Amino acid sequence: MKLFCGVIALACVPAATAGHNVPYPEEKVAEFVVEKLDVNTIPYVMRPKKDKGKKTFSDYGYVTQRADEKEALVEAAPGRRVAVRVLEQAQDGIYVCIDGLGKKASDGRIQRVLLLQWRGPDGLLKGKESSKNFNSCQVIGGLDDVTAGSSY
């Protein structure tokens, strides 16, 4: 019986993980990222104030100023700019450098490496800060309010 359960479990693993191996585009990757990125998943000090029903740059009124294969620049009306640079495409997702100004003037310029993951054509890219280092994208700027807490 234990052998049978083990065989069933091994048979189900590929089906369970199949949804995570969605192919990412090979061309116009930066444009794809700008269109599909859920901006509510980028670091707090860089993202726009959460607004119900809004998730993408275009939902928040950002307009793409420039886009090529590996880099895009989006800008909102009050002069807020965010640069998105594709660093690496890997099996686990797309590594990007997000570069822009913080919410407050005192935040200054902020730059972070994010790992973006996509669940499929109907979903959005979800970002999380990556610990992977890239020489072309050093961590710059303020701390998230969430991570700046006590060390106790």
What do these predicted ranges mean?
Residues 1-9:
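Sec-dependent signal peptide recognition
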